[in-house]
């Protein structure tokens, strides 16, 4: 921010300390080799339709990485060599900080669209929820956060890929290719309900 150039910071010491105490996964892109997170490229909580986790190490880039930042999105690369989680930042109100003219939360429709266009595109949503001038959340904002969370839970409580008593048939998955033609990575793995299996 303003005046920051007047202070000399030992950023490398910060990075080393955070890395030692917290590991690789909590430093944002300017953490150099220790970075595990990158900014999505906008402050609207929106990720590109095709967002990749990997980025490319680039010694010529300002922060050491080419994150394919274009059109307001950090898109990443399918063939990148460094995994950087694409963090989608957004505000629940019109501003990052609370104010008497910035205390109306977004609608549940807007928040839902934001969720599906961030998390649904492979980027965790970091939703800023500012406290008021008393250090508490305004009731309208707190209610909105609770309702938003409940809407997400309700949206996914019925696994639409499973058969049910009403006659819904279980989903199947097929793919034109599988890694090394190995069925251990077959398309059916996207539907087996296990967190440690996958299709590739």
Regions found by a protein language model. Give the residues of each.
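Mature catalytic domains of secreted/periplasmic carbohydrate-active enzymes
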Residues: 1-189, 197-198
